[in-house]
Amino acid sequence: MRKIKRLNSSLAEFRREFDELLLRGNVDMDTVIPVVSGLIKEIRTQGDAALLAHVAKFDRWNPKSAMELKIDPSLMKRAYEGLEASLREALHSAYNRIHSFHSKQKPQSWLDFEENGTILGQKVTPMDRAGLYIPGGKAAYPSSLLMNAIPAIVAGVKEIVVCTPTPENEPNELLLAACHLCGIKEVYKVGGASAIAAMAYGTESLGRVDVITGPGNIYVATAKKLVFGQVNIDMVAGPSEIGILADESAKAPWVALDLLSQAEHDEMASSILVTPSVELADAVDVEVERALERLDRKEISSKSIYTRGAIIIAKDMNEAVSLMNEIAPEHLEVLVENPFGWLPEIRHAGAIFLGENTPEPIGDYIAGPNHTLPTGGTARFYSPLSTEHFMKKSSILSFSERGIRELGHHCAKLAQTEGLDAHKESVLARLV
C-alpha cells in the first residue's frame, strides 16, 4: 500500500522536514521572467499586432483582425439560453449567494464633524475599469468568473473586461453563459501573459484597466507580478492547497476525499493533514488509496498526494493548530469535535471551513465567500479576493477658520522642523 509522506513532531528530524514543507509555495519565476518580459514588451510596443501573433502562436488559430478577438454578446446570451434548467438554477443560486456575501463586505464612505467645524472623512469609490483573467479551454471554470466578477459588480465597477484563452477558437460555452449572467459585454479571446499585458497597458482595441484579478499558470502569475504598479492586482497565487486539522472524531473517508479534492486540481497542489491521532492517519492512508481507484483524475491526484501531500502527527491539538498557523494554508478544514472552540486560535488561513459538513468544495462553488485565496503561506499577510479589491479610498479634509487657527501653529512648527518653509508659510498665511 502506498502511503502519504508522514512527519512526526516528536522525531529529531521533524523541524528540518517541516521547514522543507513550508517551502511548498516557492515558485521559481526567474526562469520564465525573460519570456514573460518579452511578451509584455511586444504588447506594449506593437499593440494589437502582437496580440494577434500571440493568439496564433499559443492558441493555434489565426485571427485576421483584432475585431475577431472580441466575443459577440449575442453568443453569450445564446450560451446562457442553451443551458439545461438544473445548471442554470445552480448558477443563479451561486450568483445570489456570492452577491449577498460580498455586499456585506462593501465599505462605506463616512464623515466626522468636529466641534470646531472641521470635517474629516473617507470617500470610497469603485475602480473605473476592472480586468478579469479567467482560464479557458477545456479546463474553463465558470465558478472563477462568478467569484471575480461579482465583487466587481457589487463594488460598482462600470466597465468589466474578461480575457480568456480560447484554443482553436472554441470558446467554452459554460463560461460564456456565466458572462451573460453577470452582464459582462466585453470578453476577449486572449490568454496568458499577453492578456495580462494588454489589460495593464492597453492596445488599440482593448482599453487598459485599473485592476487585474483572476487565477492562472506561472506565466500569468509572473505577468501579474511584473505589471503591478502599472495596475493593481489581487495577488500572485500559486498551486491550490488544503490543510486539514482533525482529531480522532473525524471520518477517515471524508478526510481522504477532502485531501483529494485539492490534489486533483494540479500535480503541484498541496494536501496536508495535521492530527494527533495515529489511528486516523493510518485510516486516511487506506481511504486515499481506495478513493483514487474511482477518480477520473486519478493520475494527477495520485502524483499530487504522494509527492506534495503530507500527514503530520502532532502531540496534541494545541500543537496541531500551532503547526497549521505556520503552514497558513489556502483552505483550512477543521474536523474536530468542537470546531468553533478552536477558531480563536487559528490565525493564518485563506478560508476556514468549520465542521464535518463543510467540505472545501462547498466554498469553491456555492457558499458565498470568495474562492480566490492566498496560497503558499501568503495567508500570513494576504486576504481573499473581496469587494474592496475593486474599490479605492480617498481621505477627505475640510478645515474651518477656527479649526486651522487651533492647529495651524502646531503644523507650522512641524514644517519648520523639517525645513519646509513653503509648507510653513502656506499655513501661517491663513492665520494672519
Swiss-Prot record:
It is an enzyme of class 1 (oxidoreductase). InterPro entries: Ald_DH/histidinol_DH (IPR016161), Histidinol_DH_CS (IPR001692), Histidinol_DH_monofunct (IPR022695), Hstdl_DH (IPR012131). Its EC number is 1.1.1.23. Its cofactor is Zn(2+). One of its GO terms (biological process) is L-histidine biosynthetic process. Zn(2+) binds at residues 262, 265, 364, 423. Pathway: Amino-acid biosynthesis; L-histidine biosynthesis; L-histidine from 5-phospho-alpha-D-ribose 1-diphosphate: step 9/9. Catalyzes the sequential NAD-dependent oxidations of L-histidinol to L-histidinaldehyde and then to L-histidine. GO terms for cellular component: cytosol. Substrate binds at residues 240, 262, 265, 331, 364, 418, 423. Binds 1 zinc ion per subunit. HAMAP family: HisD (MF_01024). This is Histidinol dehydrogenase. It holds the Pfam family Histidinol_dh. The gene is hisD. One of its GO terms (molecular function) is zinc ion binding. It catalyses: L-histidinol + 2 NAD(+) + H2O = L-histidine + 2 NADH + 3 H(+). The active site is at 330 (proton acceptor), 331 (proton acceptor). It comes from Wolinella succinogenes (strain ATCC 29543 / DSM 1740 / CCUG 13145 / JCM 31913 / LMG 7466 / NCTC 11488 / FDC 602W) (Vibrio succinogenes). Belongs to the histidinol dehydrogenase family.
